[in-house]
Each structure stands twice: as C-alpha cells, then as structure tokens.
Amino acid sequence: MYDIAVIGAGVVGGMIARTLSAYDVSICILEAKNDVATGASCANSAIVHAGFDAKEGSLKALLTVRGSEMMEQVCRELGVKYKNNGSLVIGFDEEDAKTLEGLYQRGCANNVKNLRLLSCDELRALEPNISKNATCALHAPTGSIVCPYELTVASVGNAMDNGADL
C-alpha cells in the first residue's frame, strides 16, 4: 500500500514524484508504457516558457513564471544540461507589432522578469542573421531550453533514489 500514486512518468509526473519523495511518504509512479518519458515528454519542444503568453493572473501564468525561475536550480541539482538562451517572438509588420505589445502587457501583468519590446535595430544587434523582413520582437531573457527526456529520467531517478517505486 502506498500513500501516493503518481500517474504518468513523463516530465510532470517525474517532477511531482521527485518533489514528493523528499517527504516521509511512500510513492508509486505508474506508467502505462515500458519506459519513462515515452509520451508527450519525449516529443515536446524543450522550451522552458517565460510566461508571457498565459492568460493574465491564471494558475498557468503563475506556475509558468515560477517554474521558469526555478528550472536552472532544479537542473543543477539533477545534473541536467540547462541553457538560458532567452526567447524571441518576431514581428514582421504593424499587426505583429500590436500582437507583441499585447504579449508584452500580458507578460508584465504575469511578472515575467526583464521582458522587453525590441526595435528593428535592437533585434538586429541581438540576432544579426535575423530575416531582413523582421521589424520588431518581444524578448524574454528568462526563456530557456532543457532536454525533457533527460529531465524526466533524472527526476524519476531521483525520486526512486529517495524511495519511490516505478
């Protein structure tokens, strides 16, 4: 008999199991497939989103921003490669510029740190090889990437080291 059953051994299930395994509880991680990270987690984009696209004030916004802020330390603890390369949303015309302004306002409301709108010149200084048609951008320096497969394997492994069963 277990105190907690974590359903799914993807990146979310792995991180939940890892976090809960720090407490004095018995945990069973249940996975339908024959290995961890074989579903959506192995096929996702690897982007750690900054949080500017989530609905203002939503739980998703809160957790995305907080998760983005935590990810570097979590990866360091688990020995997983983490790259804080930032993210850019590129605009090509006035309509795109208005969309980027909306994303900027939403990101500010969601407390995304250091978010800024870039002019064409600022964009080219940051990314010299960007399309000649690009006119503006939204820059989120807190955006990053991490291999979801490696993160899942490490987090499930850490949970198991702490006594969780898979």
Predicted features and spans:
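Alpha-helical scaffold segments in soluble metabolic enzymes
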Residues: 19, 70, 102, 154, ...
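N-terminal Rossmann-like FAD-binding beta1-loop-alpha1 element of flavoenzymes
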Residues: 2-29
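Short beta-to-alpha linker loops that shape the active-site pocket of alpha/beta-hydrolase fold enzymes
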Residues: 33-35, 123, 155
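Dinucleotide-binding Rossmann-like beta1-alpha1 core, especially the glycine-rich loop
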Residues: 46-126, 135
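Helical element adjacent to the flavin cofactor pocket in flavoenzyme catalytic cores
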Residues: 138-166
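Glycine-rich FAD pyrophosphate-binding loop
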Residues: 21-43
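Proline-glycine-enriched beta-turn/loop adjacent to the NAD(P) cofactor-binding site
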Residues: 10, 33, 46
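Short phosphate-binding/catalytic loops that engage adenosine nucleotides
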Residues: 25, 112, 164
